[in-house]
């Protein structure tokens, strides 16, 4: 009876903790759980012990493919055995991961709609990956790494046996970073690309420039970054950009640049005559104009030449040209500008600044159409809401205070046969105390929480409309985000969007079912050396994150 009393007391305490936090014990997580959840997964009943000296990867006839060689190096030397434990050797038979890819090794980055489908079978003797493309093989290898866990009782690495068939639900699954409000170093961007690949995300939307700064280095127009960058150190050279694109390619990620026009352009002031003069209500000229001058015909020649350079720098077939929040600056920069008003009268626009916007956008559409390296434009949704959109455009949705309002936006735009990308569900720069990936957080717009539950096709529309939903991009705007906090603020909150955009909707209805796998994902990424914040109330990881020793930045 004496032994029974402490056991009962412990049970009561455990129950109280569970009730207090509304969760099970903080050490509840999956073992060898795959994130995002595969389309079909069947686990075996036994696990296999693996050691780093007895495991190998056979790339078959693709042994010279740089993408697969990089993959093999990363997983063999880092990601398969991430935990800080003494590595055992010997004692097991060789375990070979055989990778078979049908298509040839591509020389460039992935293209929109490229297959990421794969088959993965792990037995007690081997692992076999089959994929149409190298991109599918990358996704399969990441899933395989999720099957590996450290058994604390036996002090061994083990891998779960499994059969997986998997492919993404949407072709566009991304992260948007903002390097204008706060400059993000190339190394920090690369770290986010690595974590993106570990969540099977495939698009980096790079919001390069905005009103605050112009860190993009233009060879043809050096006055842009010369005047618009925060300092000569806060710029991305052509080599930096090529480095990011190459790094992303090896991880199956496309890089889509954004150059927002005609608003958010104060940092373009190095180009004389590019911006309109803006005035306050007393008619006094303001210090920082923020709209392109549509009267100056030379500005369109400049935009054409500048975008030609951009397309030579960024190989992706899409080009994001912004178009948002023009109305924020219209009164100050167009309506109060006497020259603009006279120009509008001459063009027959009267006082309708929407017609002036359309005039600008129609010229921009023609510029894009005539680019030597063809690109499909992406615009923020105001270009659809307020203007005459380019019939070839993709519309990027960022508005809506509730999931229902967002769904209505998607329904409206797809009804006009425009493809859409949704970001409104996942504005991760908004933070509030609580587990916002799953719960509705008071004090924020409802759309700025419950990230796991926002489904871009959850509207009453036709099959054709829902096929026009290309996916989503989780956005982290940079007003209060820089190198020091972007990683923890993004992850694992962006992982909720990653599963929503990859996994079957019918299998991912409850965050309650997902959180043990997300907890294992968080701890896995922490062990890999990333700053992944807690996401499920008080808990712990077997191996906690530890900051490396500080070093003095070279001046």
Swiss-Prot record:
Pfam families: Glyco_hydro_20, Glycohydro_20b2. GO terms for biological process: carbohydrate metabolic process; glycosaminoglycan metabolic process; N-glycan processing. It is found in: Lysosome. GO terms for molecular function: beta-N-acetylhexosaminidase activity; hexosaminidase activity. It is an enzyme of class 3 (hydrolase). InterPro entries: Beta_hexosaminidase_sua/sub, Glyco_hydro_20_cat, Glycoside_hydrolase_SF, Hex-like_dom2, HEX_eukaryotic_N. Keywords: Glycoprotein, Glycosidase, Hydrolase, Lysosome, Signal. It catalyses: Hydrolysis of terminal non-reducing N-acetyl-D-hexosamine residues in N-acetyl-beta-D-hexosaminides. Belongs to the glycosyl hydrolase 20 family. This is Beta-hexosaminidase A. It comes from Caenorhabditis elegans.
